[in-house]
């Protein structure tokens, strides 16, 4: 039953990604922007990641206790899930995946770093292109169609942010994206 479940979840994710990309590109997706606490967003996303997450060490580091950003939380949770699921899929069992966030001027920078084998410079140039799949040397009969990171880019762009990938030192990958900062004002409490 495990493989049936895994295959059905793959189809559900594929369908959701295709629908989201289509809605974003044709302008029919309307963002429902609200101020959200980053810690809550991380917690929600981690609760929905791949069942193989237990084979990895996932941690959260926050620079500020009350860090908030303006977002459509449903879509940003989907971005985080896609990136974390990729980290789970393409890193060996026991790898560390760290989610972190910090304030940068009028934005919040969210980072998802892993200590896996990393991503080639050639692959980094195309990771966010629709239908691009990197040759990562890992056999997987359920290889993706190259939609997940393209969708992530479309969602982050729609929020007025930027998404990028870089090397993690000494090895691994870091995906980071920005969202508009929501200032917390205690004067009106």
What would you call each of these model-derived segments?
Residues 26-31, 68-71:
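Conserved micro-motifs of the catalytic ATP-binding
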